[in-house]
């Protein structure tokens, strides 16, 4: 019975979940790096994370046609760079998706601020590519890029690795930082101290990657999604291509005090008491 597994069923689930990695095959991705306002980053990054030396931010739109966990969906995301100790990663501010199981897995397991989008699209244009994310009737992200250069997968990995100080390898590893928490049933605080989760993803390009030093990214806020609070000061780099990505298991690296974190806990939900 699915509502109550027998001992054999429980054993199988435990075996399969132990160290499980989530794999995205032939992921079509448009990813950009830009400089934002350092004062904004200081305001929104919770301790023990610290703003990185440079006020970088990243955004992407992706289509996932095949995964090893049964979900086929589209996704958009927005991060600002932040450091934990000496490790630079991305503090995730928004990650709309088009599939409920992708939402549940990313949000409840790793703490990603996932919400269901109305529509997420990624389409080729005459000279490039265009991505869009619409949620609750508002286009939160509009991203377009004209192709300027094409490089082999190995060169793309080398260039991306240079951004994060990585040695050349088979793939580019990115760190995501998220805070995992749940409101208590009495709505007076949290069930437990909010936990800082570190999760690493390996990006492996498949074939040639299109690059551009210029792109157009428009971020817009709605009543429930404040993406427009992140200024796009200077476009730095954009890329488009097909990737085989692997999300590795995460780990809890810190806990924070409830009152210290409370101000940062309200962008994952739409309703804000007035």
What residue ranges belong to the model's regions?
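Short, solvent-exposed aromatic-acidic interface loops
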Residues: 93-104
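Solvent-exposed loop and beta-edge segments used for protein-protein assembly and interaction
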Residues: 24-26, 53, 72-74, 85-87, ...
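Short, structured protein-protein interaction patches enriched in aromatics and acidic/basic residues
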Residues: 52-83
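Helix-rich interaction surfaces within compact, conserved domain-sized segments
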Residues: 82-83, 90, 94-95
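Beta-strand elements of well-folded, non-transmembrane domains
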Residues: 82-84, 99, 137, 183
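Interaction-surface and assembly-scaffold signal
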Residues: 2-3, 8-13, 108-274
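N-terminal ordered "arm"
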Residues: 15-61
